[in-house]
């Protein structure tokens, strides 16, 4: 994503300060005048998919998802799906299972079910490298791309590279770094791992500590797109209050513990609306507005604000709170301050995040930087490295090295890709995706199902027009910084084979033109049928 100019940073500071001012109470609107509840993305997308299946069932049965011209028949449902432009929705009560595949782009997911070593969705031979080069070489020379450019295409069924130009060059990956973060986190912590936020009470005291576990999706909101699946600070307050009352306690000293994370909280790019401070405790990603994704004004103290909100929620449950008398930096007699829970502290209550696989999907679909940094630290934690930027760098590298992935020249200065010091190669990005698409690694499936679908979801919702051959076919993670554009993902070609690709370029001067050039390359891979 583009870096901020000085005036933009100043404007962000003004917005943050404004967001911290008390807000007037919202007027009550009669129920009869309220707008109907907005349908969730999966409901809209699934509805469009159902209509498309009903209309095209006969054609698909006869000829699969492609018509005689090589156009994907599901594209006729494009218009209906545009209303769902927010990306994969994880709303609803979360089960212990990994998330189901997004209902869009079934041809891509169909290829994922093939046995290892098969054609991944088709029995036709892999594309011919020379023929594919004849299509991609001219596109890679597009003047909209910067002076440094690289591209790799791999046949997922065989693992064979069918196209490569500068694939081993370590370039700035921008947000495609999140693919590496996702694979490392899922490999080290596991797809079913959940992040815990808890409350404890010190023995023989009324000292209650809110302990952050690093859950970036913890929410204090009553309603929201993730309120049904994300861990709720409100639920934690209710359960904590119940446990305290069972002990005969209705007045406590409240503090909060963020000691799980070490090192600098501030991302190297400085204060920025693209992410909050990297803290083990936050609610709603420290957002000062009602957004759930994208840039937003952020709190300068997400942990303190979350603890303050928790105190308010406890008081709503009849528990009077005060600051821990021994806490450093307490603000006044009622606001909780930071502390560290002792090993002897007794559990009161806890809430857990959705499975890591669901967090990965949300991160990739919306390019969520807060989740990315949290997953990098979960990787460090699982790898027994310091839970910091440096520790996460070592942990991600170590996990990918275990998987024997190509790491020459790589650096993970952060987990999100916002740091321009990050380095990756098209060879690594494509290898990560090929591994995630391999049925031998079901723990990585959410890396593929979380990729935005061209013209349908997440950061690709506006990138592909409805008449583009890549619409609904290309699934890819985008990456954008000033002068940097990347695209890495999967397609199922006209012969039904699953291919993975990674395209990188630096030194671009027109981001829209560069994005268009990369999108055309991905579409060309999907429609080539090169022999």
Q: Where are each of the predicted segments found?
A:
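Hydrophobic single-pass membrane-targeting/anchoring helices
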Residues: 29-98, 527, 531
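Active-site SXXK
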Residues: 159, 173-191, 281, 309-310, ...
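Beta-lactamase-like hydrolase cores
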Residues: 85-169, 239-248
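Active-site-adjacent helix/loop patches that line small-molecule binding or acyl-intermediate pockets
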Residues: 197-203, 208-268, 276-306, 354-393
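Small-residue-rich helix-loop
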Residues: 381-531
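Short, well-structured active-site flanking segments
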Residues: 188-203, 323-325, 444-447
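A small/polar active-site loop signature that marks catalytic segments
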Residues: 277, 283-445
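N-terminal targeting leaders characterized by basic, low-complexity, disordered sequences
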Residues: 1-22
């Amino acid at each position: 994503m583009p870096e901020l100019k000085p005036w933009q940073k100043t404007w962000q500071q003004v917005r943050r300060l404004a967001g911290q001012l008390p807000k007037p109470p919202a007027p009550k609107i009669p129920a009869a005048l309220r707008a109907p509840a907005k349908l969730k993305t999966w409901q809209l997308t699934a509805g469009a998919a159902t209509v498309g299946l009903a209309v095209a069932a006969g054609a698909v049965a006869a000829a699969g998802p492609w018509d005689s011209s090589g156009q994907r028949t599901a594209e006729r449902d494009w218009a209906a799906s545009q209303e769902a432009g927010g990306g994969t929705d994880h709303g609803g009560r979360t089960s212990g299972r990994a998330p189901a595949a997004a209902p869009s782009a079934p041809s891509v997911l169909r290829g994922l079910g093939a046995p290892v070593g098969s054609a991944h969705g088709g029995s036709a031979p892999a594309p011919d490298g020379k023929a594919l080069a004849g299509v991609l070489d001219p596109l890679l020379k597009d003047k909209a791309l910067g002076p440094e450019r690289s591209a790799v295409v791999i046949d997922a069924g065989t693992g064979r590279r069918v196209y490569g130009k500068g694939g081993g060059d370590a370039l700035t990956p921008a947000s495609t770094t999140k693919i590496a973060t996702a694979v490392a986190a899922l490999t080290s912590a596991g797809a079913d791992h959940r992040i815990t936020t808890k409350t404890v009470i010190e023995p023989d005291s009324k000292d209650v500590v809110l302990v952050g576990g690093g859950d970036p999706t913890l929410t204090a909101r009553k309603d929201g797109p993730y309120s049904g699946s994300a861990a709720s600070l409100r639920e934690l307050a209710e359960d904590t209050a119940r446990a305290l009352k069972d002990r005969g306690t209705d007045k406590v000293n409240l503090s909060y513990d963020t000691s799980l994370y070490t090192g600098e909280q501030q991302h190297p790019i400085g204060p920025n609306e693209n992410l909050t401070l990297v803290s083990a405790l936050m609610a709603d990603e420290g957002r000062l507005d009602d957004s759930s994704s994208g840039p937003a004004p952020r709190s300068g103290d997400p942990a303190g604000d979350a603890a303050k909100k928790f105190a308010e929620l406890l008081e709503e449950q009849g528990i009077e709170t005060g600051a821990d008398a021994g806490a450093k930096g307490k603000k006044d007699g009622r606001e909780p301050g930071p502390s560290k829970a002792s090993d002897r502290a007794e559990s009161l209550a806890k809430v857990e995040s959705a499975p890591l696989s669901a967090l990965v999907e949300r991160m990739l679909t919306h390019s969520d930087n807060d989740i990315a940094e949290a997953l990098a630290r979960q990787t460090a934690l699982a790898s027994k490295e310091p839970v910091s930027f440096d520790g996460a760098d070592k942990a991600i590298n170590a996990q990918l090295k275990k998987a024997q992935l190509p790491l020459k020249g790589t650096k993970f200065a952060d987990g999100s890709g916002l740091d321009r010091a990050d380095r990756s190669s098209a060879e690594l990005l494509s290898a990560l995706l090929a591994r995630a698409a391999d049925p031998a690694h079901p723990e990585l499936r959410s890396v593929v199902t979380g990729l935005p679908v061209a013209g349908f979801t997440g950061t690709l919702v506006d990138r592909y027009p409805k008449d583009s051959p890549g619409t609904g076919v290309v699934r890819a993670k985008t990456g954008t910084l000033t002068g940097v554009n990347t695209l890495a993902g999967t397609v199922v070609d006209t012969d039904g084979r699953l291919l993975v690709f990674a395209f990188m370029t630096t030194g671009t001067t027109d981001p829209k033109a560069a994005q268009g050039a990369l999108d055309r390359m991905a579409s060309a891979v999907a429609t080539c049928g090169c022999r």
